């Protein structure tokens, strides 16, 4: 019998990666169809190789994508399908609004240098990837009755892609795309300051494109400071290490900065040492502005309920705190004000 959800009410999720939320069945299907070798030929086998049960380092976790992304990248049908199935997955989890993020370049095989995942050059550009994801998400919205928007990721190791990410955010603004992100390995020294990223973020500020940045996950509080002061981020992806700099943390508390918290992810990537108190406990105690999110459910063998169960069982989170953090997530979403108001009204009504 399925476990009763830790929070059985409508939820808002702001930090989840499309390419980390693919059904193993879909990976197998396209691996077979396209003649691409996968590390296993059953759903269970694939889940065990891609999935994680115990902590690995962030680079080891990122290496998991190498196993299965070649089955999906460069294939129009696969890309539209993973977007559609993502919406179905979230609807089943009781999520009523979700912002899903991905790098258009990592799904393309044309007009992208270098071509990712050792693919041969094809004819699928990053621009068309965004169009396909939009189609899949919009069809999913119609079919499953929830609201979905998307965030396009710049990648820390590829600053040359970032100007195009900004252009795609502008081109597809409100055609599901609501913001820009900076993802990838934040241990790359000085990557927040690479000119490609800085210029793209400056352009986003100028053009009214919303901004979030992965920072302080495994990186130091200094990476968070760079995200806030140089990249002018409006939300912090993860941000756990912010609390190591009291002055910065207190400043961000006062500024009502939103932290996109992914508890189960932080355990499995080693971003959080279980011998210490999790930053989210501090966020709760200080009534900070944060959300709970699943990050990469395929790899973490999880749903968003996994994160709620973890903080409820191990950290004493209450129903009232769950309501508060979801209302904060809605307030910190990148929806236009009128749609944000509608979402909030729905939550207030359902939470009475």
UniProtKB/Swiss-Prot annotation:
Q: In which tissues is it expressed?
A: Detected in brain and liver (at protein level).
- In the UniProt entry, which residues are flagged as the active site? 217 (proton donor)
Q: Give the Gene Ontology MF terms in alphabetical order.
A: 2'-deoxyadenosine deaminase activity; adenosine deaminase activity; deaminase activity; purine nucleoside binding; zinc ion binding
Where are residues bearing N-acetylalanine located in the sequence? Answer: 2
Q: In chain numbering, where does the site feature Important for interaction with adenosine receptors and increasing their affinity for agonists fall?
A: 58, 62
Top-level EC class as recorded in UniProt: hydrolase
Chain sites annotated for binding Zn(2+): 15, 17, 214, 295
Annotated membrane topology is: Peripheral membrane protein
Reactions the enzyme catalyzes: adenosine + H2O + H(+) = inosine + NH4(+); 2'-deoxyadenosine + H2O + H(+) = 2'-deoxyinosine + NH4(+); cordycepin + H2O + H(+) = 3'-deoxyinosine + NH4(+)
Keyword line: Acetylation, Cell adhesion, Cell junction, Cell membrane, Cytoplasm, Cytoplasmic vesicle, Hydrolase, Lysosome, Membrane, Metal-binding, Nucleotide metabolism, Zinc
CDD domains tied to this protein: ADA (cd01320)
- What Enzyme Commission number does this protein have? 3.5.4.4
Principal location class: membrane
Q: Can you tell me which residues bind substrate?
A: 17, 19, 184, 296
InterPro entries reported for this sequence: A/AMP_deam_AS, A_deaminase, A_deaminase_dom, Ado/ade_deaminase, Metal_Hydrolase
Annotated PANTHER family: ADENOSINE DEAMINASE
Function of the molecule: Catalyzes the hydrolytic deamination of adenosine and 2-deoxyadenosine. Plays an important role in purine metabolism and in adenosine homeostasis. Modulates signaling by extracellular adenosine, and so contributes indirectly to cellular signaling events. Acts as a positive regulator of T-cell coactivation, by binding DPP4. Its interaction with DPP4 regulates lymphocyte-epithelial cell adhesion. Enhances dendritic cell immunogenicity by affecting dendritic cell costimulatory molecule expression and cytokines and chemokines secretion. Enhances CD4+ T-cell differentiation and proliferation.
Subunit structure of this chain's protein: Interacts with DPP4 (via extracellular domain). Interacts with PLG (via Kringle 4 domain); the interaction stimulates PLG activation when in complex with DPP4.
Assigned protein family:
Belongs to the metallo-dependent hydrolases superfamily. Adenosine and AMP deaminases family.
Query: What protein is this chain from?
Result: Adenosine deaminase
């Amino acid at each position: 019998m399925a476990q009763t959800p830790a929070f059985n009410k409508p939820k808002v999720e702001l930090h989840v990666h499309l390419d980390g939320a693919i059904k193993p069945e879909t990976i197998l299907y396209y691996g077979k169809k396209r003649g691409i070798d996968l590390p296993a030929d059953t759903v269970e086998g694939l889940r065990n190789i891609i999935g994680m049960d115990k902590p690995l380092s962030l680079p080891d976790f990122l290496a998991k994508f190498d196993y299965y992304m070649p089955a999906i990248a460069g294939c129009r049908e696969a890309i539209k399908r993973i977007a559609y199935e993502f919406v179905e997955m979230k609807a089943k989890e009781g999520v009523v609004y979700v912002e899903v993020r991905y790098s258009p370049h990592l799904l393309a095989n044309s007009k992208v240098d270098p071509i990712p995942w050792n693919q041969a050059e094809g004819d699928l550009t990053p621009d068309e990837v965004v169009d396909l994801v939009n189609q899949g998400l919009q069809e999913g919205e119609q079919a499953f009755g929830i609201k979905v928007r998307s965030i396009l990721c710049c990648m820390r190791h590829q600053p040359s892609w970032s100007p195009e990410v900004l252009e795609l955010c502008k081109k597809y603004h409100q055609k599901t795309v609501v913001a820009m992100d900076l993802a990838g390995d934040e241990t790359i020294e000085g990557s927040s300051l690479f000119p490609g990223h800085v210029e793209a973020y400056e352009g986003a500020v100028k053009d009214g494109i919303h901004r979030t940045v992965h920072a302080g996950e495994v990186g130091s509080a200094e990476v968070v400071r760079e995200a806030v002061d140089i990249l002018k981020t409006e939300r912090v992806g993860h941000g756990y290490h912010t609390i190591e700099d009291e002055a910065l943390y207190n400043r961000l508390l006062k500024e009502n900065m939103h932290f996109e918290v992914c508890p189960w992810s932080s355990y499995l990537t080693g971003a959080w040492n279980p011998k210490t108190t999790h930053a989210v406990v501090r966020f709760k105690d200080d009534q900070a502005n944060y959300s709970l999110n699943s990050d990469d459910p395929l790899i973490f063998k999880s749903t968003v309920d996994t994160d709620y169960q973890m903080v409820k069982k191990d950290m004493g989170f209450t129903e009232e705190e769950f309501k508060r953090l979801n209302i904060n997530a809605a307030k910190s979403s990148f929806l236009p004000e009128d749609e944000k108001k509608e979402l909030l009204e729905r939550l207030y009504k359902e939470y009475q």
